[in-house]
Amino acid sequence: MAGLKLQAVTKSWDGKTQVIKPLTLDVADGEFIVMVGPSGCGKSTLLRMVAGLERVTEGDIWINDQRVTEMEPKDRGIAMVFQNYALYPHMSVEENMAWGLKIRGMGKQQIAERVKEAARILELDGLLKRRPRELSGGQRQRVAMGRAIVRDPAVFLFDEPLSNLDAKLRVQMRLELQQLHRRLKTTSLYVTHDQVEAMTLAQRVMVMNGGVAEQIGTPVEVYEKPASLFVASFIGSPAMNLLTGRVNNEGTHFELDGGIELPLNGGYRQYAGRKMTLGIRPEHIVLSSQAEGGVPLVMDTLEILGADNLAHGRWGEQKLVVRLAHQERPTAGSTLWLHLAENQLHLFDGETGQRV
């Protein structure tokens, strides 16, 4: 096992525009880090740089305290699992898992032992003689992971490995990946555009946008204290409500562009008069009453999800989503009186988009 360090790493295709801005990341020995972000944010490019498949423009990459920036991929001590399984169709499961070790010149006995152990871990024991065409999608992905495991790498690199699986199988494979990491404790860097994968698998999440690491933290930290408007809007389903307005002159209320005033939990006097964006998650808005000082919202539509419901409405031109209990099913056009939990409000600078 080994740690991984990226030190002010950048990437430019033309020598002018940086698609990866200077990025530093320390991954502890045995840690599971997930890079998440929209398509084109640079997460797969960064993973390929760690793998040695893309050249680093500036900066350094270290694995197990060894600088590997210019080192060939085969010499870095990494194993990669891709979105496409990349299995040899004419080989059996056993042969696919053993092939990489065979071309490296490892002895037959040692290869057999490693394949047997990986097959046991991944519950592939009874499938070793089958061809890929005889396997399900989940089984093929386990074979791809087994091929990586037998190499006993310093670092696992996962490039959206579950993207080709259906929704039910993705849930199963997420659980299997969690169990696999708990057992192997190998340093892992995982790329996905799926925030559910990121939040369920990661010990720490790196949220990327436009080649920049917007925030690095535990799933709880990223969810509860988003560092920027982008993180607030990207993490969470449904997304955080983001309302534009200004802090009043006394710093006690947030005045929405539509004229509604929302109470603030003190400490915002230094932002008095400034344009800001206020964020609150749908589950932190609760039903209240006019007598209790609730803020009215005329409901447009209701999404019935089973375990709970989502009420959609507007304050002026600004959309608001409220998560309601299963038994709460107001009709369209009805007025909801709402209370926003003041200790769950998030304020973001109107110019920079950064959390204040």
Swiss-Prot record:
It is found in: Cell inner membrane. This is sn-glycerol-3-phosphate import ATP-binding protein UgpC. ATP binds at G37, P38, S39, G40, C41, G42, K43, S44. Keywords: ATP-binding, Cell inner membrane, Cell membrane, Membrane, Nucleotide-binding, Sugar transport, Translocase, Transport. One of its GO terms (molecular function) is ATP hydrolysis activity. Part of the ABC transporter complex UgpBAEC involved in sn-glycerol-3-phosphate (G3P) import. Responsible for energy coupling to the transport system. One of its GO terms (biological process) is glycerophosphodiester transmembrane transport. Residues 4-235 form the ABC transporter domain. It comes from Shigella boydii serotype 4 (strain Sb227). The complex is composed of two ATP-binding proteins (UgpC), two transmembrane proteins (UgpA and UgpE) and a solute-binding protein (UgpB). It comes from the Bacteria. Gene3D superfamilies: 2.40.50.100, Nucleic acid-binding proteins, P-loop containing nucleotide triphosphate hydrolases. Belongs to the ABC transporter superfamily. sn-glycerol-3-phosphate importer (TC 3.A.1.1.3) family. PANTHER family: MALTODEXTRIN IMPORT ATP-BINDING PROTEIN MSMX (PTHR43875), SN-GLYCEROL-3-PHOSPHATE IMPORT ATP-BINDING PROTEIN UGPC (PTHR43875:SF12). It catalyses: sn-glycerol 3-phosphate(out) + ATP + H2O = sn-glycerol 3-phosphate(in) + ADP + phosphate + H(+). Its EC number is 7.6.2.10.
